[in-house]
């Protein structure tokens, strides 16, 4: 019986925090911008993109460019 109360308590804590929008549930399935860049064939650079490449997005939270 105590374990069911504990599970219910944990569930309430998770669901009560959902109004802020920053729970761990919103991060499920979310990939970092660096991962998406490299998986798409690009590379993350802090400097300008090399010749014959274009900026396709950002990396590291907008601090670098994804060049492809």
Swiss-Prot record:
This is Beta-defensin 1. One of its GO terms (biological process) is defense response to Gram-positive bacterium. Disulfide bonds join 37-66, 44-59, 49-67. One of its GO terms (molecular function) is identical protein binding. The keyword Secreted applies. InterPro entries: Defensin_beta-like (IPR001855). It is found in: Secreted; Membrane. It comes from Saguinus oedipus. PANTHER family: BETA-DEFENSIN 1, BETA-DEFENSIN-RELATED. The gene is DEFB1. Belongs to the beta-defensin family. Its main location: secreted. Monomer. Homodimer. The lineage of its organism: Eukaryota, Metazoa, Chordata, Craniata, Vertebrata. Has bactericidal activity. May act as a ligand for C-C chemokine receptor CCR6. Positively regulates the sperm motility and bactericidal activity in a CCR6-dependent manner. Binds to CCR6 and triggers Ca2+ mobilization in the sperm which is important for its motility. It comes from the Eukaryota.
